[in-house]
């Protein structure tokens, strides 16, 4: 299972990568906003506004903020 982890504020958002792709397809207009950027698997350091996915891909942190809001909403209802 591939997972997304958000380390930006020392909090973790963990979601199945296949669910992430499905959410992205439904909620983002431009595929380039969430297109996975290839990165070596051994690459550990995360810089700027990017977060690492455990399978070695990177995505924009803006998308993780969106997912965080969606997950929080689901948890509180």
Curated annotation (Swiss-Prot):
Protein name: Uncharacterized 9.3 kDa protein
Organism: Vaccinia virus (strain Copenhagen) (VACV)
Domain of life of the native organism: Viruses
């Amino acid at each position: 299972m591939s997972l997304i982890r958000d380390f930006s504020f020392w909090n973790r958002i963990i979601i199945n990568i296949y669910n992430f792709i499905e959410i992205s397809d439904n909620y983002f207009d431009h595929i380039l906003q969430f297109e996975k950027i290839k990165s070596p698997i051994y690459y550990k350091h995360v810089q700027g506004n990017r977060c690492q996915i455990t399978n070695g891909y990177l995505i924009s942190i803006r998308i993780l903020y969106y997912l965080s809001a969606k997950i929080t909403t689901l948890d509180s209802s």
